[in-house]
Structures are given as structure tokens and as C-alpha cells.
Amino acid sequence: MSAYRFEDKTPRIHPQAFIAPGAYVVGEVEVGEGASIWFAAVVRGDLERVVIGPGSNVQDGAVLHADPGFPCLIGPSVTVGHRAIVHGAVVEEGALIGMGAIVLNGARIGKNAVVGAGTVVTAGMEVPEGMLALGVPARVVRPAPPPGNATRYRALAERYAKGLSPMALPRRYRLTLRGQDALNPFSELHLRLKREKGVLETLRRAAQGFPLEEEEARPLLLEGLIAPE
């Protein structure tokens, strides 16, 4: 998670919220209990406040921002889909903003309403409660099916909070002088390492430029046979 104070504006993030690695939360931002902000999302409260209500989710690559006089207010149990933009708008409880949709300053999305993927809701437009808006520019077309995504994402965020952990990727290593000596079949070091299962085979792979997993590189590093490139 990357959370930043901007001047005198500081994010307030509930301890039970989930902020994925690589997401950015900046300035006057309030994140409610059980809310989630996913990978590569940006929530920027530098010019005006941004509020994300309890149980809401801001999915991967989405952007929330606001202009002076137009706060970005996301109600409880709202879904903001992948790469969607909500800019200075109000999104009421249970609504869904589809993938790649854009909602502009002063717009209001009613309770349990749905903005379809790729739709552009123009400045000041209102989408009534429980209705579906589609198109560029958006038009209200019919009643929306119940969104329901927020509950699923809240459960997923709880799993991520417990189960997400970084892992080391395979990397290439160069042979040290000691490592080069170890590949000399007449050296004492080579004869000793022959008795250690797999060490010389792994060393040869490193010499050929193959990436090594952390676990297989460790004994070679301890022996001083290889060094990171």
C-alpha cells in the first residue's frame, strides 16, 4: 500500500480496509470499514475530499479524483470496476460503475443503479435509483439487475488480507572466481562438491545463464560460488 499525506491533508483508512500493493491513496481520502482498493488504483484527494464508504471496492486501475466544489463521494457497498474513472461525482449505496466507465463532475448515480462498461456519464447527469445507464453519452435505458458485486469483493479482500505474500522471482547469477574453480574437475573444491547432491548441476546451470530460484541459489551463495548479476 502507498498512502501519502499531501500538504495538510492526510488519508484516514479504517484498519479493516484492504489496500492492495501498488494502489495509491493521497491526501484527503476517507476509506471505510471493509472497503477495498485494488492493484494500480489511484485515489487522489488533493483538491477536494474523496470518501469510499464501508464495504465498497475500487478495482484494479480505477481512478477516483475530485475538483474544488465537487467531492468524490462513494457510498457503502459500491463497486467501481476495473479502469473506471469517477471524477467529482456522487455514487450512492449499492451502485455499480462498470469497467472502463467514466462518471464526471457533479453527476449522481442513484442507489443500486448500474453504469454499464465503457459508458460516459456527463457532468451533472443523474442516474435514478435502480436504473441502468448505457452509452456515450450515457442514456438511462431500463431497470438494472441487482449488482451484488460488493459482497463478493468484500469477502475476496478478506482473503487477500490473510493470504497475499510476496515471492522472489528466479534471477540470474554470475560465477565468482571460487565458482569457476568449482567447475574445474581437477580442483579440490570440485571433488568436495561432487559429494553434495545437486550443487554442481545447479552451478553449471548458473554458468549457462539460466535463472535460479531462491532456494536453489542459497547453497551456492553460502559457498561463495555465485553472486547476483
Locate predicted features.
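Glycine-rich hexapeptide-repeat left-handed beta-helix
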Residues: 1-13, 46-54, 60-62, 66-74, ...
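Extended, small-residue-rich solenoid/repeat segments and analogous flexible loops
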Residues: 1-36, 42
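Short Cys/His-rich Zn2+-coordinating modules
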Residues: 17-18, 37, 76, 97
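Small cofactor-carrier domains centered on a conserved lysine used for covalent cofactor attachment
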Residues: 38, 59
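A hydrophobic, small-residue-rich beta->alpha segment in the mid-to-C-terminal subdomain
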Residues: 134-141, 192-207
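Acidic, low-complexity/disordered tracts enriched in E/D and polar residues
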Residues: 162-201, 222-223, 227-229
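Short loop/turn hinge sites at secondary-structure boundaries
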Residues: 163, 205-210
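Short amphipathic alpha-helical interaction segments
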Residues: 209-222
